[in-house]
Amino acid sequence: MSEYRIQGATGEWEVVIGLEVHAQVTSNAKLFSGAATAFGAEPNTQVSLVDAAMPGMLPVPNRECIRQAVRTGMAINAQINKWSRFDRKNYFYADLPQGYQISQLYHPIVGEGSIEVQLDDKNPESLKTIGIERIHVEQDAGKLMHDQHPTMSYVDLNRSGVALMEIVSRPDMRSPAEAGAYLSKLRTILRYVGSCDGNMDQGSMRADVNVSVRRPGEPFGTRTETKNVNSVRFVMAVVEQEAKRQVALIEDGGTVVQETRLYDPDRNETRSMRSKEDAHDYRYFPDPDLLPLELDDAFLEECRASLPELPDAKRHRYETALGLSAYNAGVLTADVETARWFEALLAETAAKAKKPEAEVAKQAANWLISELFGALNKLGASLETSPVTPAAGAELLALIADGTISGSIAKQVLEKMLETGDGAAAIVEREGLKQTSDTGAIEAAIDGILAANADKVGQYKAGKEALFGFFVGQTMKAMQGKANPGVVNELLRKKLG
């Protein structure tokens, strides 16, 4: 891929991007209390005395939250720090009842790691490694609600104290596409691990986007931080718009100010929120209510043993062991639910065919990607809501494989399956869709077509071999799509010489 550059009035500019991703930890309880974490609960119904910062209430670390952070670090090949510590980040805001946030500035639980991203879906060589500086665990704040009263804002503390992983990348990205690819890959890894559901629309994963511009080869410029961006598409838009804004500002003789900004998706622009604070503004110091975290080898081994097959390893296995194309392997592993669905389909298909999975993998993958995805997309549905299960898909593939129906008829059957929820065999029987291999009937249809198209027969015999497809199509049409394509091809070749 060509390098991304912003063409200004005075020449080319390079954009430098780093992301700080806040990922809500998948856990039934909060980081330092036993309060629930379910999304969508009534305001202030999931708040403990610790979350509300009542006097005398002391935090107790949730083992599961620590475990999920360690597993995430292992999934990105990061250094796991056996000794880490919590710090207080001091600031005042109405949604922060303690007056400080418990975070990890000086000694995070996870150190340096990296993620490899593919920048072009159709080019497996378009790889780039994005460095990750650290992952630290911290509390989320509450939520201000401004639409409940004409003159007052209300506070919902359900989110207060929920565990977050802040995943801080290095400034290694150089284009909106790279930022989007990195965020998508990170979300995929988190979903595979099960440490965050990655639902950006629900706020359980959001990104702070750091952007600066410079002349190629020069030192980094002054960066701005656009807070709480909640979709991959918006992150890419922020990078593009903020970089263009900075270039225009500099070329007009202005100076980029280190500040915090917000993104307005309706106007597709960023706007200033406040000046950007430095660490000393928050007066960090070790939290006196919490002992340092000390992780032993047994705990780390437990975390490592619980990791699933990760997307890069799964993709490699699909290509090498199952013989799938790099593109198909990429599509099937980009989402953990898709990978699970495919593997269930593959197991069912192999069992019905009494063949190894490697022999039926291409058929299963092609059908899932080309047929089922396309049909679901037309309906505005997804695999999660599909009435067609992996077992039902395998039943349909078995009917194609044994010659009961043709590929074209299978498309009709799939539409009926999605419409009714019925099985493929029942639909084929009810609708009379079985494929015929009756050579007499097929031969009669071919004879009629050749007689009606004598001119094309002459052209074919004169060397215009592309017309063979025309004869096949006409025969299938005459047989209402029910003729066995193999028999049609064989008989046509005999008759056309």
Swiss-Prot record:
Swiss-Prot/TrEMBL catalytic activity: L-glutamyl-tRNA(Gln) + L-glutamine + ATP + H2O = L-glutaminyl-tRNA(Gln) + L-glutamate + ADP + phosphate + H(+); L-aspartyl-tRNA(Asn) + L-glutamine + ATP + H2O = L-asparaginyl-tRNA(Asn) + L-glutamate + ADP + phosphate + 2 H(+)
Keyword Nucleotide-binding: yes
Highest taxon listed in the record's lineage: Bacteria
Keywords: ATP-binding, Ligase, Nucleotide-binding, Protein biosynthesis
Gene3D superfamilies assigned to the protein according to its UniProt record, in alphabetical order: 1.10.10.410, GatB domain, N-terminal subdomain
Keyword Ligase attached: yes
Cross-referenced SUPFAM superfamilies: GatB/YqeY motif, Glutamine synthetase/guanido kinase
A Pfam short name: GatB_N
EC number annotated for this UniProt entry: 6.3.5.-
GO biological process, one term: translation
UniProt GO molecular function: asparaginyl-tRNA synthase (glutamine-hydrolyzing) activity; ATP binding; glutaminyl-tRNA synthase (glutamine-hydrolyzing) activity
Record-linked InterPro entries: Asn/Gln-tRNA_amidoTrfase_suB/E (IPR017959), Asn/Gln-tRNA_Trfase_suB/E_cat (IPR006075), Asn/Gln_amidotransferase (IPR018027), Asn/Gln_tRNA_amidoTrase-B-like (IPR003789), GatB (IPR004413), GatB_C_1 (IPR042114), GatB_Yqey_C_2 (IPR023168), Gln-tRNA_amidoTrfase_suB_CS (IPR017958)
HAMAP family: GatB
Family affiliation: Belongs to the GatB/GatE family. GatB subfamily.
Role noted for this protein: Allows the formation of correctly charged Asn-tRNA(Asn) or Gln-tRNA(Gln) through the transamidation of misacylated Asp-tRNA(Asn) or Glu-tRNA(Gln) in organisms which lack either or both of asparaginyl-tRNA or glutaminyl-tRNA synthetases. The reaction takes place in the presence of glutamine and ATP through an activated phospho-Asp-tRNA(Asn) or phospho-Glu-tRNA(Gln).
PANTHER family, sorted: GLUTAMYL-TRNA GLN AMIDOTRANSFERASE SUBUNIT B MITOCHONDRIAL AND PROKARYOTIC PET112-RELATED, GLUTAMYL-TRNA(GLN) AMIDOTRANSFERASE SUBUNIT B, MITOCHONDRIAL
Quaternary organization: Heterotrimer of A, B and C subunits.
Name of this protein: Aspartyl/glutamyl-tRNA(Asn/Gln) amidotransferase subunit B
Organism: Novosphingobium aromaticivorans (strain ATCC 700278 / DSM 12444 / CCUG 56034 / CIP 105152 / NBRC 16084 / F199)
